[in-house]
From Swiss-Prot:
Heterohexadecamer of 8 large and 8 small subunits. RuBisCO catalyzes two reactions: the carboxylation of D-ribulose 1,5-bisphosphate, the primary event in carbon dioxide fixation, as well as the oxidative fragmentation of the pentose substrate. Both reactions occur simultaneously and in competition at the same active site. Although the small subunit is not catalytic it is essential for maximal activity. Belongs to the RuBisCO small chain family. InterPro entries: RuBisCO_ssu, RuBisCO_ssu_dom, RuBisCO_ssu_sf. This is Ribulose bisphosphate carboxylase small subunit, chloroplastic.
Amino acid sequence: MATGAGAGAATVVSAFTGLKSTAQFPSSFKMSNAAAEWEQKTTSNGGRVRCMQVWPPFGNPKFETLSYLPTLTEEQLVKEVEYLLRNKWVPCLEFDLEGSISRKYNRSPGYYDGRYWVMWKLPMFGCTEASQVINEVRECAKAYPKAFIRVIGFDNVRQVQCISFIVHKPE
């Protein structure tokens, strides 16, 4: 369940109620045999399912993996970084003042639309301990307290980004 912390208020999502049986509808709403046969041959769009709701995006931005969860504790952050290192990924820190995609000067996507964050120092090649990454996060947060900071794990063999999560949000 989401908890409200910040500008957006949390909304409670109702429990899954499932599909309703047509037995409770009046006979005028019941399908003819032809309609029932057609329904059996086609897929349902789930129109009677009431559990699907949209996360309210206004004043409640979400950023990366794990961003729907509460802020990571120090212990949870260490576990995530250890997972990253255990998979032999190279940790890298990035920071940005906005933390989300924003297009100020043009409608089409491009380099300056907020997708690319500023890299904090160099990727941490040869990093073997989570404490090294945590110390860099602290140092970056001290230098840029009003910035969003994320940790990225790169696989330098496949040359892809494998994990990315926010580790610091501005107050």
